Amino acid sequence: MNDMFSLDMSRCSLTECIDKMCEIKSRSHPKIKQNYKMLVNKLEDIEKQFGCTIMPAMISSVFWNHFVPFLAEQGLKYSTIGHVKANLIAVLNWSSKYGVKLNQSYNEVDVPNYISSKIALTPDEISHIYHFKIGKEPTFSFRSKKVLKLRKNKIETLERVRDMFVLGCNLGQRYSDLVRISPENFKNGQFSIVQQKTGNKCFVPINSLSIDSRITFAILEKYGYHAPYTGDINNYNTYLHELLYHIGEDFMDEVHIDNKINGVITRETKLRYQLISSHSARRSFATINTMRNIPRSKILRATGHSSEKAFNRYICYDDE
């Protein structure tokens, strides 16, 4: 009986520690392994590059000085690198309770909390997206830039993606929660759902917090109070970029992105539509309602954020 609940991880490699933690915690957090998949992949890349097996005690300030630039060179945003860092430190802290020895500098890492590519849309832009007639105006190929005629099934897909994005702007939820909506989530003009990521229950009074309640109810009724689009999030973002590319206009503006690491600032230029994703809808909801002077407590109750610090990262003011 005692052996059943004892755990000695003193000889485990870092990836073995991750596997063991995910195995144990998956009983209460079924999707935890998916959350750590990127970390495992990047650690395996490092092991392959240097021909070694990474042990927990090898994670030090020296390791971080190599690992962070390595992730940046692979094209990861600093917000994503920060997520990888947090996951790795969480694994080390958990493993240390079961015999794993840590280097004293295992958590001495500074990933810039500095990224200026956050995008929030205005109410006019959201309305423009909703009212854009897909296939009725000259449409250019997403890749070859030649004028083309969209097929009926492609038009239907882009319409569903458009409605899904606009609905996200009006309800302020993550994509993983929007795909799960059903009539049971709506009662007396209020939307509520237990969020998949946090387990928090949020409440959105549609008439007072949605960006446009008329459009919100029109979309909901069109799809029987279910999600307009339920495909893979990567496909969703690809279709969203294609939709915004077809709309053109303000979404084709150049945006300069400044990133800072190890004291060096680098700048890259992208078109605005390339920076808009599923999460931009949630940012737009938070930013617009903040600018409307809606009480912060009501917005947090709608977005499900448990702290103002976490919520503030969603706000994109004019200078951003």
Say what each PLM segment does.
Residues 150-154, 226, 241-301:
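Short, basic (Lys/Arg/His-rich) helix/loop patches that form interaction surfaces
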Residues 6-12, 31-34, 47-69:
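A Lys/Arg-rich helix-loop hairpin that forms a DNA/phosphate-binding surface
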Residues 78, 82, 101, 105-175:
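Basic, Lys/Arg- and aromatic-enriched nucleic-acid-binding interface segment
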Residues 197-199, 303-320:
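Catalytic-site neighborhood detector that most strongly recognizes the C-terminal catalytic loop/helix
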Residues 198-263:
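C-terminal catalytic core of Y-nucleophile DNA break-rejoin enzymes
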Residues 3, 10-42, 73-75:
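Short, aromatic/basic-rich helix-turn unit that serves as a nucleic-acid recognition element
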Residues 42-45, 74-106, 140, 174, ...:
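N-terminal DNA-binding recognition helix of tyrosine site-specific recombinases/integrases
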Residues 111, 146-154, 176, 187-225, ...:
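Basic, Lys/Arg-rich DNA-contacting stretches centered on the C-terminal catalytic core
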